[in-house]
Amino acid sequence: MADTGYYAGYQDDVDVDEQKRHQALYLIGIILLVTVCLTVLWVCIMLACYVPGFLKKTLEAWLNSSSLMKRRVASTLTRTPFEATGPERERNWEARRQSTTVNPASQPNTGSVF
């Protein structure tokens, strides 16, 4: 028998050790995967709880802000000239509404609902 460098009582269980190592690595991989999935789920839940509160605070702060800022945002969103936004816009609503019902052909049709 050739000297393998091990003591005489050692039994070479390379196949068994390799299978155990493979199972241990597989188990560690599953545990890490479950941990990552739970962490991602927790982050999604925290974001789902945080975002509505953030939006509420932001909108409340915006509603309490100056009317000048609201007019600028409204003119940007609606692509209306800044001068056409404001209290006189609401006062002129009836006149504008009647003019569009009298002559609807003058309004350009963009083909979209919104």
Swiss-Prot record:
It comes from the Viruses. GO terms for cellular component: host cell plasma membrane; membrane. The keyword Transmembrane applies. Residues 86-97 have a biased composition (Basic and acidic residues). Signal peptide: none annotated. It is a single-pass membrane protein. Residues 98-114 have a biased composition (Polar residues). Residues 79-114 are annotated as: Disordered. Keywords: Host cell membrane, Host membrane, Membrane, Transmembrane, Transmembrane helix, Transport, Viral movement protein. One of its GO terms (biological process) is transport of virus in host, cell to cell. The chain crosses the membrane at residues 27-47. Belongs to the nanovirus movement protein family. This is Putative movement protein. It comes from Faba bean necrotic yellows virus (isolate Egyptian EV1-93). The gene is DNA-M.
